[in-house]
A protein has these predicted regions:
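Conserved C-terminal structural/oligomerization subdomain of aldehyde/semialdehyde dehydrogenase
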Residues: 1-237
Length: 237
């Protein structure tokens, strides 16, 4: 059977063989991406153009080309999840240290005086720009291999405030880190978050009950986890 027979992520040792003709390679890549899972992908080929094409299209956290799929070496081989396989840093943790910050206090000094409609919210997300890929950096190769580390921006991040000033501050922080920010223009209704497309995360600095409703709505989404970010920038970190 083919890739579509895999209904969930399975940790081995399990070997699933799916044969295909060479002209079907594009369909195979699409089928793999459609599963939503993508922890590690391995490719064995001598064709440089095929390596380049597949590496750019496959949605996986780690890509091994012509090498053993072994555990990553911290500081040399970055290792992180993707999509339904998780997005945590795992063994790539040392590269995340400069993003750590202390959790701030809830900001209840601002609020929205109107509600942002679902139509306006959906339209704003659909027209948001796509995040840019940062230039590759190269890590030490213990056995002479090439270890490239790439970083990609999340899908658009919704800056929900509360209030115009808070939303603008959130958007500036997202943009400064290379992300794509979408500023709310009114109070977001929690139920609208469940089916909202192109959503990478939601930033909310307001009251706890609203944050709880946002959390529940995001948890009800299908596909990869979309985080609710309530921490505020800390100048001391």
């Amino acid at each position: 059977s083919g890739i579509e027979a895999l209904e969930q992520e399975v940790f081995g040792p399990v070997l699933h063989l799916a044969t295909f003709a060479s002209h079907q390679i594009n369909a195979v890549i699409e089928a793999i991406n459609n599963t939503g899972y993508g922890l590690t992908f391995g490719l064995q080929t001598r064709l440089s153009n095929r390596t380049r094409d597949i590496a750019q299209r496959i949605m996986a956290g780690n890509i091994y080309v012509n090498r053993n799929q072994i555990g990553a070496v911290v500081g040399s081989q970055p290792f992180g999840g993707h999509g339904l396989s998780g997005t945590g840093p795992k063994a790539g943790g040392p590269f995340y240290l400069n993003r750590f910050h202390a959790v701030g206090q809830q900001n209840t000094s601002h609020s929205w005086d109107h509600i942002m409609s679902q139509t306006a919210l959906t339209a704003t997300m659909k027209t948001a720009a796509t995040g840019l890929q940062s230039p590759d950096s190269f890590l030490p190769g213990p056995t002479g291999e090439l270890n490239a580390r790439s970083t990609f921006a999340k899908p658009p991040i919704l800056c929900a405030g509360p209030g115009k000033k808070a939303a603008e501050t959130q958007a500036k922080a997202v943009t400064a880190l290379g992300g794509v920010a979408v500023k709310a223009t009114g109070q977001i209704q929690a139920e609208h978050l469940t089916d909202l497309t192109r959503l990478g995360a939601v930033i909310w600095w307001g009251d706890g009950p609203t944050a709880r409703m946002f959390d529940l709505a995001l948890a009800a989404r299908a596909g990869p986890i979309v985080a609710l970010i309530t921490g505020q920038p800390d100048r001391a970190h």
